[in-house]
């Protein structure tokens, strides 16, 4: 499934009787077994240390970035039998163009002409930094202290078919249908008629 892993690791050993430096960089990528189920992962580690008698001071930084296609919707037995065992419904939308696919939709119980958005992904970056101090006070006692900071940022990207624009906080004059005079169009119950569009959304998160 075109899976590849590369890693580089360097280590200085003890330099000048006091200093050490270690670093590692890793990359993993795969197309995955499930269609549009690929992944791309990178990670790093850096560590610098100072040693002097009973004192140790160490700076550690590690983290990584992940981009993973969404492929955890699952599939029914009929969908796998008729669409193949690698079937993935993620990113599917209805279409009638010449490049569409004919698939079995078990939820509706019928064949449909659909296409797939290939970049429906989960994306996340995290960085961890640590400063570690260790002081040996005696044969029985050691004092240790650690300061740390973690930062994370991520989002998932999805194709939404026939989405209502007001659900995404579009202003009313864009989210609801209007006539030539700019008045809102209403249905038989007097409710404004929502504008629907195909769109790509990104839902974000950050953590500290």
Task: Provide a role label for each language-model segment.
Residues 1-11, 183, 203-208:
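Outer-membrane beta-barrel transmembrane domain signature of Gram-negative proteins
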Residues 2-29, 34-73, 129-136:
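Transmembrane beta-barrel wall of Gram-negative outer-membrane proteins
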Residues 3-5, 28, 41-43, 124-128, ...:
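Transmembrane beta-barrel architecture of outer-membrane proteins
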Residues 37, 146-148, 158-161:
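Composition- and surface-driven signal marking solvent-exposed, interaction-prone regions
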Residues 56-132, 157-207:
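Acidic/polar loop-and-plug regions of large Gram-negative outer-membrane beta-barrel proteins
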């Amino acid at each position: 499934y075109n899976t590849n892993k590369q890693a580089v690791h360097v280590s200085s050993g003890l330099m000048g009787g006091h200093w050490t430096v270690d670093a590692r960089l890793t990359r993993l990528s795969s197309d995955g077994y499930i269609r549009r189920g690929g992944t791309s992962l990178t990670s790093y580690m850096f560590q610098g240390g100072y040693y002097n008698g009973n004192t140790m001071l160490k700076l550690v930084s590690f983290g990584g970035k992940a981009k993973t296609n969404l492929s955890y919707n699952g599939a029914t037995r009929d969908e796998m039998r008729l669409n193949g065992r690698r079937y993935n419904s993620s990113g599917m939308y209805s279409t009638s163009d010449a490049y569409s696919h004919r698939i079995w939709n078990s939820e509706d119980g019928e064949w449909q002409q659909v296409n797939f958005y290939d970049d429906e992904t989960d994306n996340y970056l995290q960085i961890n930094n640590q400063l570690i101090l260790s002081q040996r006070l005696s044969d029985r006692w050691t004092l240790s202290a650690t300061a740390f900071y973690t930062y994370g940022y991520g989002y998932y990207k999805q194709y939404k078919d026939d989405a209502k624009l007001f659900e995404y906080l579009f202003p009313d004059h864009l989210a609801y249908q209007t006539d030539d005079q700019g008045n809102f169009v209403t249905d038989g119950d007097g409710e404004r008629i929502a504008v629907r569009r195909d769109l790509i959304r990104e839902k974000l998160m950050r953590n500290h």
